[in-house]
Each structure stands twice: as C-alpha cells, then as structure tokens.
C-alpha cells in the first residue's frame, strides 16, 4: 500500500474523490463498503431516475447503459489500484475491456454492487476481473486492464 492511511469503511464520496479524479456527473460510485488492499473492492452505485443519462436511455423504459456499468466498475478498480499501488495513483488509464457480458437490465431503484478483484499485476499495469450485481443477481461481468502510474 502507498504511504496514505487506510480509509475507514465505508468510504464516503469525499474519501473516494481523494482516490480518483472523477467528479459529478461522471463519478459513478457512491461509496465503498469493502476494500482489501492488493486483493479486491466492493463499491455501491444507487441508480436513480434523476440520473441524467436515463432521460434519453430510453424514454418511457429507462435502462442504465451497460457502458456506464463498466465505467462504474472501472472507477471502483481505480480506487483499489490507487490504494494498492506503492506510490499511490496519479493517473489511471483503462487499457483493455474484454469478455464483457450483460446478464440483466439495471433500472432506476436498483442498487449496483460493483466488485473488482486484482487478477494480476505488473506495475504499472493491473488486470482486474469484475462484476456488477443487483439483488444478488449478476447484471454484468467484465475483465479490465489499466495503466496506473
């Protein structure tokens, strides 16, 4: 772990913002409920009808976009990478998305549970295996890699 003190769980939005540069309206995790440095992270995103993207995706049948589910997972992975990198995170660039599968729609009122695990690391590169679940049911699965420096 880097020289920072380990944040208390759950991590609120202010603690998350100390780890990654994303801000409203593109910050897609609300809190971190579990974090094991160098191992895994579990983050939460509440999906609300007031999420701006739902106005156009799709009118009358709002569905949270799969690409934003993957982005939320990537943001959770970036928090894990930040706290697992020996020097902390200064920049995180997504380098690959593979084997993305979407199993069920995510709709307003759903709570997305975003899980990311470090599958392999060779700093500055990290590989993650991740998923998003709603009510214990897998909504999406994906493998990611990132350049974290």
Question: Can you say where each PLM-predicted feature lies in the sequence?
Answer:
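Conserved positions in beta-strands of structured domains
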Residues: 30-33, 98, 103, 115-119
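Flexible, low-complexity linker/boundary loops enriched in proline and small hydrophobic residues
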Residues: 2-33, 145
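Beta-strand-rich interaction surfaces with strong enrichment in secreted/lumenal proteins
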Residues: 17, 60, 102-104
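Compact, glycine-rich, soluble single-domain proteins
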Residues: 48-51, 55-81, 94
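Hydrophobic beta-strand-centered segment that forms part of the acyl-chain substrate-binding groove
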Residues: 4-10, 77-113, 139-141, 147
